[in-house]
UniProtKB/Swiss-Prot annotation:
The modification Phosphoserine is found at S27, S672. Disulfide bonds: none annotated. Residues 601-659, 713-777 form the CBS domain. It comes from Arabidopsis thaliana. The gene is CLC-C. This is Chloride channel protein CLC-c. Homodimer. Interacts with PP2A5. Belongs to the chloride channel (TC 2.A.49) family. The chain crosses the membrane at residues 92-112, 142-162, 190-210, 215-235, 257-277, 287-307, 341-361, 380-400, 466-486, 488-508, 520-540, 541-561, 741-761.
Amino acid sequence: MDDRHEGDHHDIEVEGGALHGFERKISGILDDGSVGFRQPLLARNRKNTTSQIAIVGANTCPIESLDYEIFENDFFKQDWRSRKKIEILQYTFLKWALAFLIGLATGLVGFLNNLGVENIAGFKLLLIGNLMLKEKYFQAFFAFAGCNLILATAAASLCAFIAPAAAGSGIPEVKAYLNGIDAYSILAPSTLFVKIFGSIFGVAAGFVVGKEGPMVHTGACIANLLGQGGSKKYRLTWKWLRFFKNDRDRRDLITCGAAAGVAAAFRAPVGGVLFALEEAASWWRNALLWRTFFTTAVVAVVLRSLIEFCRSGRCGLFGKGGLIMFDVNSGPVLYSTPDLLAIVFLGVIGGVLGSLYNYLVDKVLRTYSIINEKGPRFKIMLVMAVSILSSCCAFGLPWLSQCTPCPIGIEEGKCPSVGRSSIYKSFQCPPNHYNDLSSLLLNTNDDAIRNLFTSRSENEFHISTLAIFFVAVYCLGIITYGIAIPSGLFIPVILAGASYGRLVGRLLGPVSQLDVGLFSLLGAASFLGGTMRMTVSLCVILLELTNNLLMLPLVMLVLLISKTVADCFNRGVYDQIVTMKGLPYMEDHAEPYMRNLVAKDVVSGALISFSRVEKVGVIWQALKMTRHNGFPVIDEPPFTEASELCGIALRSHLLVLLQGKKFSKQRTTFGSQILRSCKARDFGKAGLGKGLKIEDLDLSEEEMEMYVDLHPITNTSPYTVLETLSLAKAAILFRQLGLRHLCVVPKTPGRPPIVGILTRHDFMPEHVLGLYPHIDPLK
């Protein structure tokens, strides 16, 4: 980890005469009274005690930081100078080729996901419908609950035993990754596998969840898999792929994958690009905009082609459903003053209900995390309990609704309908009657939204039905999110918002000129704005979903109002989840209290540094006894006249250098020999599988006493700030440049060349306010 604040490692004992040099150098760190540059520049109690673990999915695991900075050491410079024009062309071509493959793969996975959900859920609903027609109500309930329970258990088992990181929507984890946070299996192939099949089983099981969030995570996993740079273990290496053995290029690919996931889930290519820009990515530039747009365009073409292929009935029960496209185009959109007042009211209600939703989701997630920590069995039992409750609500609540006569003039056979999805479901009703609540609860979530968005259907749903459905979906959405299955928040939020939006439209009645289907859309927009706090991307996604550009001004208005109101209470749901999971996310702004501090005020822990030519045993022992990922390299006499900062060496590069055993018995510079014997690709980030560990090194006692020149692997141009720089400016600099390490140097000469190193953990509020509890967090 890049946390350099190992409180447990302050008392280091070194055994064996071979390592007496390290013991002598570390002794300066342990002696508060000494003045060497290897000592801590702060008192012992100035340690960073922020957590180095976080919740990823439904699992607690260690976290790392990513190296988004270009590491300009001698190997990088040599590789950059030696690149030919054809190699630069290959690199550019490969970026676009991988963007195409990400779009193609994500589109295929999105289609197969929907195909599976529609067929599994469709078979289940047809079975229930046939039993209800035969008035076998108990058998219908047990068949319904049993199918849901089996599917839910399958999804939970995959998450509990194969990839706990696949639980939840995955958007907070992807957002954290693009901010520079990595965790074990966050984008692993096993996570991708469970995300796909767990999402199919979970959505088909009738939970109030969506597949949109999991699709974002799925797209990111696909991008990560394609951008691994090959695998030596499975002999999947290719010379071109070496260009992507770094976090910076993988970050761009994963941004494309996240955008492709939204495009595949909503059939909203432009909305996918804007979602990645507004919510997911922490860094953006024009070149990335082009590639994400190209990726989502590929997704759109793939989905359109596959949907056309299925229109002739070649895909089983898959038809209009699944890849949701809600056509609420009802001609000219006319509205009066009462309509505008109602829209403002919808925005306010959406903001209040959305902030309350976020608050309750946070409380439920904290409770579920306690249960999930007890082991896989408890995760599965929790999923089963929520499944049974959801089945009881979906099957039991329609009995509270009254049977409604079919509308006059409707085509014969459409009311009540016999198919698996319709707005007119008979349930227990007599001939020529339908149960409106069953058409919302005993349906796939996509079809329920489609029914709520239906235009020119003012009286199809009773006011009491909409109220019952809203309360049920609101509560079930809260208690379902957080269980150990892949689950998204978009669909529950759209369902709840569309139901109360339609309810407001019904209450207005003849006073309003807007169709109730349009009120459903505006209600969904208000609730989305109140929970997720996005505006531009949500507006475009909703317009692409509904194919109704005439609603643009009203959707913009309701989103702005709901977001403004909700911001008065708390943060967006994904921001809250990131904080709750313990992910050290760097915001794009500095906190107000940071202006009262300077960089040196939060530098913590004992700083361990190396000489340019260092003894192998000293490096080995430092790597063994700490988890630091960055070590300052100091030029010392006789190589320079005075001690000066040479740069930073990464832990991964040190391990590769030690494994190569490019040592010397004399303490002399021999970096040119190392440059000739190694290549830049040898120091590239590991792809599939884990990189080198200190335990993998096999060094003899004789080798421990030898020396190694660290200059070839040292980033000689690290970002540095003066110790007197405002902490607020340091935080903004750290965030905007995507740094992992920020060196703090002294302002006055004659002191040690480096004061300390800042990492993202040093900017976390719990660390800063822990050091200075008297500071007002709001000032």
